[in-house]
Amino acid sequence: MLLFFVILGIFVLTILKAISKQRWSWLLLAASALSLELSALYFQHVMQLEPCVMCVYERLAMLGILLAGLIGASSPNNVFIRLSAFLLWGISAVWGILLAIKHTDYQLHPSPFFTCDFFPNFPAWAPLHEWLPWLFNPTGDCSDIVWQFLGYSMPQWLIVSFSLYTLLFIIFAISAVLKTKKQLF
């Protein structure tokens, strides 16, 4: 029985390796991140929910996943391009989880001594909050819960989203380094 599951796992990973070399899979990754970014902009500009500094950082992590999808789609059969896209995907997904967990902690355990930064800490050579204020200018408070769905706040849903992105990254990364039958013999 164990042998069956090992063979099935190798078969699935081999299929995933082939999928990672196809443009549509990378475009699907980019489209999913774009849909979440557009949702964030809807919450901000239509529902008038002000983003905080952590929200801005979480947006940036999501944009990293979007960019990874676009990079991977640009030349999915090129090993260097695919590796670069995988690295950006993994870094952005893990960074996003860490940010969302920290943001959730701020909301669940507010402190009278904690206040959000007024400005994001972007490098001086890339002040995104000045270049694109409609996307990166924080005006809200990190500890405020301004929206909930099924009893969970936005950062809690982002933990779910970034966790799924991280899980998919791990699965696809494992499949990418898996040697196929032709390479084994």
Swiss-Prot record:
Gene3D superfamilies: DsbB-like
Entry's transmembrane regions: 26-42, 61-76, 84-101, 157-175
Intracellular or extracellular location(s): Cell inner membrane
Location (main, coarse): membrane
One of the Pfam families matching this protein, by short name: DsbB
The family this protein is said to belong to: Belongs to the DsbB family.
GO BP terms: protein folding
InterPro entries: DiS_bond_form_DsbB/BdbC (IPR003752), Disulphide_bond_form_DsbB (IPR022920), DsbB (IPR050183), DsbB-like_sf (IPR023380)
Disulphide linkage map: 52-55, 116-142
Name of this protein: Disulfide bond formation protein B
Membrane topology qualifier: Multi-pass membrane protein
Gene Ontology molecular function, alphabetical: electron transfer activity; protein-disulfide reductase activity
One GO CC annotation: plasma membrane
Ranges of the Periplasmic topological domain: 43-60, 102-156
Gene: dsbB
Cytoplasmic domain ranges by topology: 1-25, 77-83, 176-185
Main function: Required for disulfide bond formation in some periplasmic proteins. Acts by oxidizing the DsbA protein.
Record key words, sorted: Cell inner membrane, Cell membrane, Chaperone, Disulfide bond, Electron transport, Membrane, Oxidoreductase, Redox-active center, Transmembrane, Transmembrane helix, Transport
Domain of life: Bacteria
Organism in which the protein naturally occurs: Psychromonas ingrahamii (strain DSM 17664 / CCUG 51855 / 37)
